[in-house]
From Swiss-Prot:
InterPro entries: Trp/Indoleamine_2_3_dOase-like (IPR037217), Trp_2-3-dOase_bac (IPR017485), Trp_2_3_dOase (IPR004981)
Binding residue positions for heme: H237
Naturally occurring in which organism (per UniProt): Bacillus thuringiensis (strain Al Hakam)
Cofactor note: Binds 1 heme group per subunit.
EC top class, as a word: oxidoreductase
Protein name: Tryptophan 2,3-dioxygenase
Amino acid sequence: MKENEKVIMEKGIHTDFKENMTYGEYLQLDSLLSSQKRLSDHHDEMLFIVIHQASELWMKLILHELNAAIESIKQDKLQPAFKMLARVSKIQSQIIQSWDILATLTPSEYIEFRDSLGQASGFQSYQYRMIEYALGYKTPHALKIYEKDPELHARLHTALHAPSLYDVAIQALVKEGFPIHKDVLNRDITQPYEEDATVEAAWLEVYADVKKYWNLYQLAEKLIDIEDWLQQWRFRHMKTVERIIGHKMGTGGSSGVSYLKRVLDQRFFPELWNVRTKL
């Protein structure tokens, strides 16, 4: 060691792990970091794989928080739910940044390994589908995509039949005494939610008297945050796809950019957007 070289290792730092769990063992890094298996020899396929795997990890956390928030709202514990939903929004903002990295992939680079994907596509992401279900956008026909894996198909079937975040938010309105139409309360929750005048009237009253309905107002704003971030994610997705493959058909069989543009018009919480015009 050179005389002017400083020792940066503190005396108390643990170095003997013969009988103790290490950082890598706790995070199962051997398994995690060996999951990036390229199907081509092209350098940039690693970027493509890592971006999508990282997004799936973030989506796992989103589902963890959304499901917990739904249970909290069911139990009238809105304050803990607010923290969970705020965390979801932060995660969404993080995922959006990943499109900047993927956009460094040029069309010429992508076509070098695109055929290796076969028919695999982000459209088949079961976690993204479960997020849509948790937010209330139910698509029963999409379950066919997952028939290859019976266990996964069963999980999605359960998610399809579970009340969404918006379903429990509407129940919170009912508990506060708002008269919500019975057709909304008894609807088939396996189908996409359709806006309702009584739900809109309830939210309008919440926004008109924020002090009286503070918790419901906060819940509504948390929902708006999540949908806002999701729409930003969808827009960045669409523009990144357009930048890389133009208007070619997607690997999953969709029309590509044209399909992604149509998706931008989907609303999860329509009445919460409508009240902004009505106030």
